[in-house]
Amino acid sequence: AGYRNAGVSRLSLGLQSASEEELRLLGRIHTREQFLQSFRAARDAGFDNINVDLMSALPGQSEESWQETLRFVCDLEPEHISAYSLIVEEGTPLYEEYGEMCADLEKYGDYASMPKRLQTKYEGCKCLPDEETDRNMYHHTKTTLAKLGYERYEISNYAKKDRNCRHNEGYWQRKDYLGLGLGAASLVGRERFTNTSDMSEYLENSGNLEKIRTDRETLTREDEMGEFMFLGLRMTKGVSKKDFQEYFGTSIEKIYGEVLEKYKKQGLLLEEDGRICLSRAGIHVSNAVMADFLL
């Protein structure tokens, strides 16, 4: 209630999964019931704009358990749902346990296509879903939420009418943002920087922005072009050729003509009304497509 009274109008709650076993494997410290209590407390405090974060393609997760998570959340009728597919990042505890499995899945596509020795190695494990299962989860998410009035406006984000997350849209449209606090990231003009994540250093230099800010980077024109495309293609409306021309003073075809033509021919990119966006097939290989726009 204190947040609400202070003027905070939107909350984001990280459920990730409605399965206690999946939460445990992720190393989450909350339970399904604790999330439910938090959600109800937010409603009781007057919050009418709540996002719930979900995560698919978890170790041991089946299409059925993912559907149960969706049912659980949809029954609560949040205004916004973010549903991301798990990425096993290097340097994390999950990577230590599943890094090799990720690499093998990327190489062979599914467990049935792996050599016998690898099939034996992973037999009985809490395995990561293969590509087909991951795609099925994504499709089920999109169709289920569409039936309930959620519009997908970004690869992994769904919102009720007029409830898009303006915060995230600012990132995808490369608007300036200023991060406050430990480890917070910022983008101001062409300058990108991150605050120190060391509490002692942060307190010692409180008020001295130059010492608090670390990992500074001045983006080149090529960096900005790459980000314009990479981030813009995440949105269902895609990127505007007119906006590209106005921002960079050159046509999108002059810079990316060969890449655009390649993916249009493959049916992974579409062009309509002066905008370029991912096709349905392109969404499933979006990272590979978008990476080709980084100069």
Please provide the spans of the model-predicted regions.
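Minor-groove-contacting beta-hairpin "wing" of winged helix-turn-helix DNA-binding domains
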Residues: 275-279
